């Protein structure tokens, strides 16, 4: 028998959920565009090789990959950064810099569904291409922070780490597989301490190396507390230069007015192999089992890997499936109104009655009132019962006798009161009552 149920890890989004999403998308879009980012949308699927080049081992394992009818290896996009980088390489290498793009789109990963994690999920994000300066990092992290503030979230932190410092740390430990170590550190929050220590030993670290890693991931907190510790730990010129850059980044974020939410966490790696220096993620305390609600970082080598000229870039993605449950849990989403403000009921089967009902409905709609009309031909009592179940505040009754007198009836569904109004002034009167 054919399977006609919903595929595991996906969801049917009903009107109330869609209304919440639309509200969140609108708030985020306003902030993105306020920073002069412009919207783009790439294909839902790309050649699989695009994602295999630098997305990271974990993401590659989770690809929805298949061959099309032409035998080409295709994958649904697991993230947008690779696709946007490909778009840039294909068409915009000679465009004026920086390029500031944003997207709101669905992604696909074959992973185990859990709280805030699905196999089809939505992200809102930006990519800033063409600047290697700390000002670009500050612009992107400030936008990241203000996007959460725009939807009413205030109890969260933006934790900033640095892949250059992690690379340096791997060298200090004598680890050749620095990417492997970063992947392991990135998974630390998904393991108990004992499991993490065991994984470090399996990776080949001795007791001293394990202790150093455990010490590193505890170096986190306010920038003025953490960065001096980093200066003591790292001694190479490259590391010192990067710490100096972090000091400047924090200073610029203060000018943006978002330093209240900023923390430094040297144990952040992020899961994608294409990050090259600054990385960051947002965490909002909750009882829902949801961890990071978004993140990003600088990826200065990815465009070159895709065949383009060396071009610095940075960006982030906000996880919508993680953000919305937290907003609901905190009571930050607005009350969703799905009912119409006015329901128009033509009584009987007379054509002029139907036409008048349509004209009134359309007049209200043109005035931006949410208006609906009875379409099933049911009896008046059943139509009124239906309007009552919807919670409609006002009903317009259009009957043949009233119409012959140039009238229609307006019914207040809460009080049950009815009054006769001029047909020609019906829309105007209803608008006055609604305060439109």
Swiss-Prot record:
Keyword Cytoplasm: yes
Leading EC class: ligase
Annotated catalysed reactions: tRNA(His) + L-histidine + ATP = L-histidyl-tRNA(His) + AMP + diphosphate + H(+)
Enzyme nomenclature, EC number: 6.1.1.21
Pfam family for this entry, one: HGTP_anticodon
Gene Ontology CC terms: cytoplasm
NCBIfam families assigned: hisS (TIGR00442), hisZ_biosyn_reg (TIGR00443)
UniProt record similarity statement: Belongs to the class-II aminoacyl-tRNA synthetase family.
Protein name: Histidine--tRNA ligase
Gene source species: Thermococcus kodakarensis (strain ATCC BAA-918 / JCM 12380 / KOD1)
